[in-house]
Amino acid sequence: MATELIENKLKLLPEKPGCYLMKDINGTVIYVGKSKNLKNRVRSYFKSKQVGRRAELVREIRDYDIITVSTDKEAFLLEITLIKKYQPYYNVQLKQGTGYPYIEITREHDPQTRLTSVVHKDGGYYFGPYPNVYAAQATLKFIRKVYPLRRCHGYQGRPCLYYHMGQCLGACFKKVPQKEYDEQIKKIKSFLNGDITSVKQDLTTKMEKASENLEFERAAEIRDQLKYIEETVEKQKIISNDNTQRDIFNYYVDKSWISIQIFFLRQAKLLRRETRMFPLTDAADPEDAFTSFIVQFYGQKNRILPKEILIPSGFDDDTLAEVLNVAVRTPQRGQKKSLLDMAKDNAKLKLDDKFRLLELGNRKTKGAQKEIFDALGLPYGHVIESFDHSHIQGADPVSALVVFKDGEPDKTSYRKYKLKGEVEHQNGGDEVRNTREVVRRRYGRLLREHKKMPDLILMDGGQIQVDACEDVLRNELNLNIPVAGMVKDDKHRTNHLLFGDPINGIPLKLIPLDPKSEGFYLMTRIQDEVHRFAITFHRRRHAKNALSSRLDSIKGIGPKSRNKLLRNFGSLKKIKEASIEDLRAAGLTLPQAQTVKLML
């Protein structure tokens, strides 16, 4: 079942490709997935019945995060990086060391091209990773045919088979000039970086010619070759071919708030990102706030500067670079510009989500509270107060007060009341006395201190509690505060509000709320909260009084000694576990400590 937080976030999902990170109650990433349409995919986890391992996953999800990208291919590549970074429990497809392949140009005297699953800091050139392993193999095969380097094991005194096939420059029997290697490597790098127009044109011409000559198998082979080249050499934004350590900053401003997105690229991978959002002061300029944030960001403890920082246009790169002592650049085109744009898109997405969540929150808070006031025919009020009583067969009676402001609990205003007299039985008369006492104490004090009264009082009960509350307010305190009762059905479920206006001759009547409405949800929340608060307070008081009673029965332990024990140990169990020395340290004499140990 989705939490309230998840339900709200599901309404904000974009219909874009990207990755989603499912988190458990501790905020740990337990699953990473990708989709062409984040809205449909993420919603499917919570809006349809799940079975097996997926059902187990959904039961653990307490929150999620998303990263949007431009294409499904980028989502696939980002998913690889995120899985390797977080090693989520429910991801079994990608383990450390068994990832997708890269195409490598080795850094050797006689270099070669090959597939590898591990990127080493050896000066070689790495391209990838490639999700389609077969396509990567086919592309490597094409490169070796069109841009040959070395295919053999090195010098052996005679030409190898690949040399005769035109797939080796001849390191097997001669010294190949470095210039020749450099020219080939330049072509391979250009090809793998996306410059494939001429190659595609050449292959397309050959495919058409083969088809005209009725060489259909040959034409199909070239067609597949084109497909594999497009799949592996397509430009990638998430996995860069540049291994420079790089941080990318961009921002988005709306409604006097700024959202700043930071991408951290390490070893050609987007390892993580951070989002910071904060309101702008009236005098703050967004550009100044952005640059100030960057400087403060790297001023934090344990924050390591990258080799390069990318920021959008409109800023003094040189000054920022001088302050940070690192290269600061503003790309105008190409892959870096695309990454910068992606950072801005994600900054906007995060800020839009924040505003939409606030709007949804207002519907669940202020909007819900308005529904309650509307149902009662009252003008909107900001403050609702609610009471509940608790006791066990009349022992240790207490009352509790909770306060909700604009639909949100204001816990600093909560109050606990120890009721003065004990009651003998739990009946209507007891409820009347408890209600009258706590209402008199609460609102009598507000009157004496000249404090603002609530806009509505909700009593956890029916006509008995409502009548008792209104009698004290109007006849003793001369206050006219609306009072309603939260009535439960025979299954102890909140059912209706009980409300009337005795002053104007309107009798009490049951007022229903739509069980699916936000107002009904808020009413049950208030009722559950005041009940919880009262029960918790009563349990603590009852336990303390029970302990006091047990201590009072011990000969030689008077009120002062009892209070010392209560203050130092708090519970009967801890007093029992205490040693003679511990009891003496709490202020008891040796005979008293020995008596306590003997009696307990």
Swiss-Prot record:
Residue span, GIY-YIG domain: 15-92
Record-linked InterPro entries: GIY-YIG_endonuc, GIY-YIG_endonuc_sf, GIY-YIG_UvrC_Cho, RuvA_2-like, UVR_dom, UVR_dom_sf, UvrABC_protein_C, UvrC
Subcellular location: Cytoplasm
Keyword annotations: Cytoplasm, DNA damage, DNA excision, DNA repair, Excision nuclease, SOS response
Top-level taxon: Bacteria
One GO cellular component, as annotated: excinuclease repair complex
GO terms for biological process, alphabetical: nucleotide-excision repair; SOS response
Segments forming domain UVR: 197-232
GO MF, one annotated term: excinuclease ABC activity
Subcellular location, principal: cytoplasm
CDD domains for the chain: GIY-YIG_UvrC_Cho (cd10434)
Family assignment from sequence similarity: Belongs to the UvrC family.
HAMAP family: UvrC
Subunit structure, as described in the record: Interacts with UvrB in an incision complex.
Biological role stated in the UniProt entry: The UvrABC repair system catalyzes the recognition and processing of DNA lesions. UvrC both incises the 5' and 3' sides of the lesion. The N-terminal half is responsible for the 3' incision and the C-terminal half is responsible for the 5' incision.
Protein name, per record: UvrABC system protein C
Source organism (scientific name): Lactobacillus acidophilus (strain ATCC 700396 / NCK56 / N2 / NCFM)
